[in-house]
């Protein structure tokens, strides 16, 4: 696979003024541009300081010129970088000079796209470049760097290699029936299949954690009217984002607030109080609240610790558990601890349920416990050298692969259908290939790289 032969150019540094600005060129005309702009032959992979010339030999700027002949460059093509002063006018003049020499303006992400097309990066590594640039916390940046260095891709590659080995064994048995391999009696296929499924499950769990660090966690605040949901939102946001009154049902619609906790992005959603009501508008708000609960990464179920219902909070709204079937993603918040006198604390039950006693109003007592808990849910303390950045599309691909393997196992154990297992293995391999770009449509590639910065 090779990239187009046009030569592209773009400003690679951020818009605005700065001490240094970089113009990047990639393609067959890079060597021509290097000599025309610097006025001399450039030694590959050396930094040359000097003037940058226009077509009539006027000096446009001065700085460093670096020439990287392909394939030993970022894109795999001939690459020229001009590092001058970071003023927008100077950079525009340099870019205009590149266009005069036959270059065209690069599309967003086109340099990374060419690196992918020339096998310098796989798709997950290319996406990690954008993730590293956009990282909103040190942990997210570390994860993105590990993905750029190939940590995620290597995990996917290992899974793919195991699937290929399994496919070879299964398809050989199908193609050569005279060997009379009994899949079930053999036990080899089932053992290999379960090994891949277990490893895939681990990668999917770690990818989910990486996606939370990259995209941010959606936290929905739910509970009865007047439990203190809006007060909790305001306390987390550090401002009066929601109206707070003593009137039950003040919040009737979804209210979203984007906050950061030590650089970790959270999308906090305040919802209407859960109760039966004849008010048409409030009823719509309750329906939207239940929908938001079902889509949340984490639910904070707020109860008024002074109310009798606090003794059995999960019984206060039956539809709640139906909407949020995974209790492990629900944190119980016992609010108004300043009124009950109960200690500010975080407790974990034997079954793993987390309860935090706090006061959303009284100087935010207990908020630090909640913030630390939310950071832990996002993997803030995760220091594993194997952690990596992941995107939602990666999670979908991993889930599709997992579903295919589950289906294939059922075909094998319930029906002994080796032919159907072979097809499920093929689908699982294709889903994994979509992560690294081994199997990707042109439309998908276009959407991914168009989201990059120009010059990357």
Swiss-Prot record:
Residues noted as binding Mg(2+) in the record, renumbered to the chain: 230, 251
Binding site for K(+): 226, 245, 247, 250
Residue ranges annotated for the TrmE-type G domain, each copy included: 216-379
Binding site for GTP: 226-231, 245-251, 270-273, 335-338
This protein's record includes keyword Hydrolase: yes
EC number: 3.6.-.-
Signal peptide positions (record): none
Annotated Gene Ontology cellular component terms: cytosol
Cofactor note: Binds 1 potassium ion per subunit.
Subcellular location: Cytoplasm
Keyword terms, alphabetized: Cytoplasm, GTP-binding, Hydrolase, Magnesium, Metal-binding, Nucleotide-binding, Potassium, tRNA processing
Matches recorded under SUPFAM superfamilies: P-loop containing nucleoside triphosphate hydrolases (SSF52540), TrmE connector domain (SSF116878)
PROSITE patterns: G_TRME
InterPro entries: G_TrmE (IPR031168), GTP-bd (IPR006073), GTP-bd_TrmE_N (IPR018948), GTPase_MnmE (IPR004520), MnmE_dom2 (IPR027368), MnmE_helical (IPR025867), P-loop_NTPase (IPR027417), Small_GTP-bd (IPR005225)
Predominant localisation class: cytoplasm
Cofactor: K(+)
Source taxon at top rank: Bacteria
Subunit structure: Homodimer. Heterotetramer of two MnmE and two MnmG subunits.
Protein family according to the UniProt entry: Belongs to the TRAFAC class TrmE-Era-EngA-EngB-Septin-like GTPase superfamily. TrmE GTPase family.
UniProt-listed PANTHER family: TRNA MODIFICATION GTPASE GTPBP3, TRNA MODIFICATION GTPASE GTPBP3, MITOCHONDRIAL
Protein name: tRNA modification GTPase MnmE
Gene symbol of the encoding locus: mnmE
